[in-house]
């Protein structure tokens, strides 16, 4: 069974009244290469930026190795008036009955016949689902009591995390940007060294050794003394990938790494990423490169209008799309 290292539950991001991400849930397993595809404006880049807290999510839970590093439920963002809240409360009451009934069915079957070992994981999952519904903040307020509702809205907790904690998360979930985010006046080697000495407090010699190792792995060993502004776009992206690797992250987040490149440079970067995928490092890649998604990723997620519309293995997504929206997207992309 694969180890889930990043768990995303009901992640939402609002900019004012604009809902950019709407209840995104996704499990990321160790060694996954996940391609996030979808039209421009579907929330893909915002999703990545929320994962390592470059953007503060509005609500949801983000857990790394089962330990939440972001967890908040904001009633005031979801239920703009009392009537909406009452509807939500009624919905969760029904969900509570449904999950409780499901749990009872599995437990009774197991009591009757303990040889049915396959029921154990079902019971465990049913308990988890029941507790999740029961502990939802919506269920903790009596919806007949308007005063209690108003008080709860005022007492909605705000998200609190220190910069030190954010920096720690970013050493595990490192971002590679489409715009490179390199220091133009530094040389290639120093860009990779600086990331380590500032973030991980490694000594210079150790950082230099690690930088040379990863620059060699992306075929940039002959340009280590070049200034960043002397490189092509493809070479800059390779340096950005090497810099990310120097931090020794468990997950690398790629935000459209080839979109700012000339066509002839795209293959240069994609080949480095393909080679990287064979090492077993976990990657989440926002991309418009359908061949990469089809041939390198082991999971493809299609997003549209802030939702995950479909997800699955590449063959499942590309050869047997279930929704008309994905079919239309693939038809346009294939032209």
Which positions does each model-derived feature cover?
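Helix-to-loop junction immediately C-terminal to a conserved catalytic motif
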Residues: 52
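Conserved ABC transporter NBD signature motif
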Residues: 60-71, 77, 142-157
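Conserved signature/switch motifs of ABC ATPase nucleotide-binding domains
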Residues: 226, 247, 279
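Conserved ABC ATPase signature
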Residues: 227-231, 235
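Catalytic Walker B motif of ABC-type/P-loop ATPase nucleotide-binding domains
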Residues: 252-255
